[in-house]
């Protein structure tokens, strides 16, 4: 894991951990939050909380058209706090690749994967970048933090080595910065995304879809009891 610089309110905890790691190679970290903390999302109106992977697995079915809730943005910051407001996610299919600002991050344009082609599907591939739009994470505005190449909009997609290549699953299992919550609202022009590959022509929008994350809020100061709860986990 990577940790930022100590703040006035968190200096004691930060420096205690830093000192411990000078003579130890491993440390358990618990992030205790108050109800004030919110994850940044690509929605301008709805904020939410996703505490960790276990919590995500519990609540992810509540997002998207199938649940009736498309108000939460398609992209959600992986952790609560204002730092997530520095993030931007972009997703691009074949039609928009030539004019995409981030095409140089990838070897070639996305298209139709071998998996989808073998099943009569088309245009399932997309490229995704996660960008430090404001420079608050990396220290440099516009730094590309993560790239996901040739991932598929098909829910059953497999890569050549047999591993899961469904874009949402790839992002949610390996990104350090964002969750991909659903394909509705923000990403609705990527039609049929999230369905099986067989016979499916996936949406191929003419330009990359860019979404900045907002609404992230830091935790309020912890009480002694809340700190103790963290130690009990």
Language-model regions, residue ranges each:
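Surface-exposed assembly/interface segments
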Residues: 1-233
């Amino acid at each position: 894991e990577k940790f930022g610089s100590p703040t006035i309110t968190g200096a004691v905890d930060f420096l205690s951990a830093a000192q411990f790691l000078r003579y130890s190679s491993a440390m358990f970290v618990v992030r205790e939050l108050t109800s004030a903390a919110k994850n940044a999302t690509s929605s301008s109106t709805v904020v939410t909380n996703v505490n960790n992977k276990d919590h995500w697995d519990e609540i992810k079915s509540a997002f998207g058209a199938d649940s009736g809730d498309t108000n939460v943005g398609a992209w959600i910051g992986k952790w609560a706090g204002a730092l997530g407001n520095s993030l931007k996610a972009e997703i691009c299919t074949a039609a928009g690749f030539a004019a995409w600002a981030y095409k140089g991050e990838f070897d070639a344009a996305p298209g139709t994967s071998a998996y989808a082609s073998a099943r009569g599907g088309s245009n399932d591939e997309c490229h995704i970048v996660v960008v430090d739009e404001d420079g608050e994470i990396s220290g440099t505005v516009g730094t590309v933090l993560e790239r996901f190449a040739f991932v598929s909009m098909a829910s059953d997609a497999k890569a050549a080595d047999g591993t899961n290549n469904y874009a949402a699953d790839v992002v949610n299992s390996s990104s350090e910065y964002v969750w991909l919550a659903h394909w509705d609202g923000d990403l609705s022009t990527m039609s049929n995304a999230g369905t099986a590959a067989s016979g499916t022509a996936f949406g191929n929008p003419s330009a990359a879809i860019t979404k900045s994350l907002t609404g992230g809020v830091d935790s309020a100061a912890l009480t002694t009891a809340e700190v103790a709860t963290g130690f009990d986990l």
